[in-house]
């Protein structure tokens, strides 16, 4: 048996969180945020307003240490999400790892737009490949 290769400090990590319902959503997102805060990593939360409110209620005063963005506003123009939300936050913290939760506001989008959303996820991998970022992308399996 061989040991896993060590992770590079500046490695971009992009896990998905597939969830059903509020309990699973909070179980996957809140610890991600708190773990980052515990080790001194800047954290940004860019999710639709309804989910933003859920997480804020769980975080309590920890929310004061998180960059909060409502993706129903910040993500209205998909072409601006990478440069104005994701990359901007990463670039604002050039030394050390940052954490981002980025959830696209899927609800209300027609099925024909799904391929563009999938392409956007792939572009995120390219746009942040040179940054020390852990980006969690939640997907509500009942809506996607």
Where do the model's predicted regions map?
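Non-catalytic regulatory/interaction regions at protein termini and inter-domain linkers
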Residues: 1-144
């Amino acid at each position: 048996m061989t040991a896993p290769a060590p992770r590079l400090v500046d490695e971009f990590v992009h896990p998905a969180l597939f969830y059903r319902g509020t309990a699973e959503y909070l179980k996957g997102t809140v610890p991600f945020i708190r773990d980052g805060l515990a080790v001194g990593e800047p954290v940004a939360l860019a999710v639709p307003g309804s989910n933003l409110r859920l997480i804020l209620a769980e975080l309590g005063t920890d929310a004061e240490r998180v960059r909060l963005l409502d993706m129903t506003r910040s993500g209205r123009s998909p072409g601006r999400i990478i440069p104005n939300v994701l990359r901007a936050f990463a670039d604002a913290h050039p030394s050390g790892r940052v954490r981002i939760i980025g959830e696209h506001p899927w609800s209300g989008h027609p099925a024909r737009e799904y391929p563009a959303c999938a392409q956007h996820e792939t572009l995120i991998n390219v746009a942040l490949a040179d940054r020390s970022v852990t980006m969690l992308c939640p997907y509500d399996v009942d809506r996607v």
